[in-house]
Amino acid sequence: MGSYGLLESTLKEILEAIKPLREDRLTRDRVIADLRQVVQSLENFRGATVEPFGSFVSNLFTRWGDLDISIELPNGSHISSSAKRRKRSLLDLLFRVLRQRGGWNRLQFISRATVPILKFVSSPHGISCDVSIDNLEGQMKSKFLLWINEIDGRFREMVLLVKEWAKAHDINDPKNGTLNSYSLSLLVIFHFQTCQPAILPPLRYLYPGNLVDDLRGVRAVAERHIAEVCTTNIARFKSDRSRLPNRSSLSELFVSFIAKFCDINLKAYELGICPFTGQWEYLSSNTRWLLKNKALFIVDPFEQESNPARTVSLNNLTKISEAFVTTHRKLVSGNQTRNSLLGTLARPHILPFNTNGPVNYSRYNGLPNLTHRAGNSPQMQHHYRAGSSGSSQVQHHYQAGNSPQTQTHHEYLPVSSSQMQGQYGYPRRPTPQGQHQFQNSRQSPSFQLQMQSQHPGQGQRKWTPRP
């Protein structure tokens, strides 16, 4: 079996072990119901709703994934925007109530975080939970990632694999200065935008505005507007027959993903990763980015001045880069075995995992032995159907052994933008005035497909997003 064939089968084996089953979703539904019962019993939370978000809503969670929950406070039909002081007060109340009633372990109230969070583990189910107040932004971002699943089903598979790989290399832990899962999902989006041919467009073509800023007024109206714009543009993008299909296998996409970020520690000094524009952006092009710059800047496509990777420290950025380099070296080596690949791509407990056996959640959160039985139920099917299949196999532009410096990428760019310079779609240098690069180019509804010599005569195509 060739190196890519062995890698492909190993990745599929890992996916079978980490993909949630129907019972895993039902377990999280029960945790939400238990918390809802507690919240509704408290006078201070009268009229509040308990709503999940994060990977559970976007269908990007694994069998051991944490559960993000937002308690939405009543504000008539309008979007609630409680002050941070009130959020802290209510979470502190909930903290004391849960501790008193029992059934909730490892309670921790993080009051000084940007978003105050109450963390705990549901004792009956062994599920780790993060609870916040009025986190509608998180809910809408989660729904957007779910909608992206409609474009190409390989997106979900890549996110699950990348998250497991990152955990295996201890770089998926924001509390200790590495990447959070949302940042890892954005890296996968960015890779799908810059691979050749591109699988995803710049996200500004799916929603051209700042999504978080548009969450105001009547909640139902705001949510419906965002959903209509996104789903319309996604459908239009998928139906564009002039778009070159990308039929790369999962293994080819994974290897090129690892190669793309091997020198992320070097690029991060002056470049930010921007899924909104689908390209690397010079940090000097936006003074607000410079003011908020950390060791690594990943532009939140739904809140463009925010950096989801702000917790990454300089030392850990080197660690993250080394994980990419080490993994790339092993993936392109000629002496791969199943066991060596598993040791590189997954945590030790994944290796012998029986996908139809009991899921011991406490094994991963430090609780006493709490075993949850996941029977031989069919694999969970989400209420949104994933898009085009990612299992087809064709040749890929990336060849084993190529260094990141020699790899080229296929990018979608606005018509008014000039050709990108350098490797990995390096952007043009900013103007001396340091103008925001989003504003420098005309916001033409069309975008240009940059072609390479192996695709002669393809020329330019247009695709118009809904404003």
Residue ranges of model-derived segments:
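Intrinsically disordered, low-complexity regulatory regions enriched in Ser/Pro/Gly/Thr
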Residues: 33, 41-46, 60-65, 87, ...
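Eukaryotic intrinsically disordered and solvent-exposed regulatory patches
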Residues: 35-38, 53-58, 102-106, 114-117, ...
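Residues that form ligand- and interface-recognition hot spots within folded domains
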Residues: 39, 43, 49-57, 61-64, ...
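Conserved catalytic core of two-metal-ion nucleotidyltransferases
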Residues: 42, 87-139, 157, 168, ...
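Basic, alpha-helical interaction scaffolds
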Residues: 140-181
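Composition-driven recognition of long, intrinsically disordered, low-complexity regulatory extensions
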Residues: 336-467
